[in-house]
């Protein structure tokens, strides 16, 4: 399978992220859902040839989800013993890999201070379950992603935010979007791809005007739309991938109007 890479007409987005990575700075990718933040992190992982350990944040995220947990293990002699299973944070630190924290502002603020020492010059933490002091191996880097203003998100603690350098990641469009659709979906029909790109421009305009939510204009939704367009009429593909996800009837009607204009 061909490895897809992050693309953006603003080349400084990736160039700056790579430069910050090489300086061992914590990177906070900030942008709307589906704008390619995870793809950018994955591309950095591939370019730097470092594996990536991912944490998916939610209100249910706890210290065990970050650091790991104790469990009972049967050793080679057949005796049971209590062992600690490393979680993504500790794995990344010990191996000198990348730690990617997705939707970091979905986590409860009281869950994240355990990472303060990981994110500052110390690059270390004390495992509260074992007492072990863990210092990050060379190569360890932290990338986090944030979606601001969405349901379920919480204001990011200023002390935590100050440990990162922010890079804005906006939606892609135009020729770059055409290339992404061709590379990441099954759709290869140039004319239909052009119509989808124009349709996306209308969605983004409506998003900026507050007529529809940003989720409706996500790159992820467009890739799904393009895939479905190879097996069903484009109108039904839009219905399945975008319209049916929306609760507001006015948003649904606005997108139906955009379909009539573009297809």
Swiss-Prot record:
Protein name stated in the entry: Uncharacterized protein SE_1092
Top-level taxon: Bacteria
UniProt-annotated binding residues for ATP: 31-38
Similarity section: Belongs to the CbbQ/NirQ/NorQ/GpvN family.
SMART domains in the record: AAA (SM00382)
Record flagged with keyword Protein biosynthesis: no
Bridged cysteine pairs (disulfide): none
Keywords: ATP-binding, Nucleotide-binding
Pfam family, one: AAA_5
Organism expressing this protein natively: Staphylococcus epidermidis (strain ATCC 12228 / FDA PCI 1200)
GO molecular function, one term: ATP binding
């Amino acid at each position: 399978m061909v490895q897809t890479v992050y693309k953006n007409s603003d080349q400084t987005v990736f160039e700056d992220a790579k430069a910050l990575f090489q300086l061992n700075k914590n990177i906070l990718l900030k942008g709307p859902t589906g704008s390619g933040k995870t793809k950018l992190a994955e591309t950095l992982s591939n370019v730097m040839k470092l594996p990536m350990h991912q944490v998916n944040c939610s209100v249910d995220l706890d210290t065990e989800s970050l650091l790991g947990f104790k469990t009972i293990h049967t050793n080679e002699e057949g005796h049971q013993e209590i062992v600690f299973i490393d979680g993504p944070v500790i794995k990344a630190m010990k191996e000198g890999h990348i730690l990617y924290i997705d939707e970091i502002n979905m986590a409860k603020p009281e869950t994240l201070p355990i990472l303060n020492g990981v994110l500052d010059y110390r690059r270390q933490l004390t495992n509260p379950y074992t007492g072990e002091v863990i210092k990050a191996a060379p190569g360890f880097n932290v990338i986090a992603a944030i979606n601001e203003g969405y349901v379920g998100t919480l204001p990011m603690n200023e002390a935590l935010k100050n440990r990162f350098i922010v890079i804005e990641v906006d939606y892609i469009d135009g020729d770059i979007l055409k290339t992404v659709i061709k590379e990441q979906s099954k759709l290869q029909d140039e004319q239909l791809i052009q119509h989808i790109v124009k349709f996306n421009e209308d969605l983004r305009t409506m998003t900026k005007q507050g007529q529809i939510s940003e989720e409706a204009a996500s790159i992820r939704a467009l890739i799904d739309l393009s895939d479905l367009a190879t097996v069903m009429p484009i109108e039904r593909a839009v219905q399945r991938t975008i319209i049916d996800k929306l609760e507001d009837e006015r948003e649904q009607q606005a997108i139906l109007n955009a379909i009539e204009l573009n297809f």
